[in-house]
Amino acid sequence: MRNKKKFNEFMNKTIEELKDEKRYGTAHVYQSTLNAFCEFCGCKIVYFHQLNRATLKEFETHLRDKQLSWNTVSTYMRTLRGAYNKAVDQKITTGNSRLFNHVYTGVKNDVKRALEVEEINKLLNEVPLKRLPEDLVRCRVWANLMFQLRGMPFVDLAFLHKSDLKGNTLSYRRHKTGGQMIVDIPPTAMELIRQYQN
């Protein structure tokens, strides 16, 4: 007998729980996965019995046909697997331990994401600042500072205080993790900080 319990309802409940826990990034991944799977199935209601090996393999092929990267495919599959395993643990559906064995759930590092030094220099220095609108000047200064301050995330740059600056050293706490960071400031970055510190 087929399981008439709705997978999409379980996913939506999980998404709300994640939001309640302020895990918005994970909630977004779950929502994106659910949207992609419902779009693939061609319906808004998805039942647990539709999560089978053949459907998952077809979903994987569908995602690749849409030019999604293997890492995105893997994220969707791992999210489906996580939700499925949670439903099994809660006795909402019966489990098949090999259900996701034939779809890709790994991580590929084959795409170069870093820029070469020449490319960074071109982005940050090619057009003189005086030829740019005010908002683009500010954006380029921030990008330049983030690069020179060891790849500082924008959120950390935005939350810096003047008291974090002591001489040529920045001492601050990471916004995301709370970890203490100490960064020596190169002279070119120091010049930008002095110029735009307000």
Regions found by a protein language model. Give the residues of each.
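Hydrophobic (often cysteine-bearing) scaffold residues that line and stabilize catalytic clefts
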Residues: F7, T26, Y30, N52, ...
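A short, glycine-centered helix-capping/turn motif at helix boundaries
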Residues: L145-D156
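Flexible interdomain linker/hinge and immediately adjacent N-terminus
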Residues: K57-E58, T93-P128
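N-terminal DNA-binding recognition helix of tyrosine site-specific recombinases/integrases
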Residues: A36-E39, H49, D65-L99, R150-M152
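Conserved catalytic core of the tyrosine transesterase superfamily
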Residues: D65, A114, L129-N144
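Conserved hydrophobic/aromatic pocket- or pore-lining residues that grip, position, or stack substrates
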Residues: L56, L80, L123, L157
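Basic/aromatic-enriched alpha-helical hairpins
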Residues: M1-K66
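Conserved tyrosine-mediated DNA breakage-rejoining catalytic core shared by Y-recombinases
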Residues: N101, F159-Q195
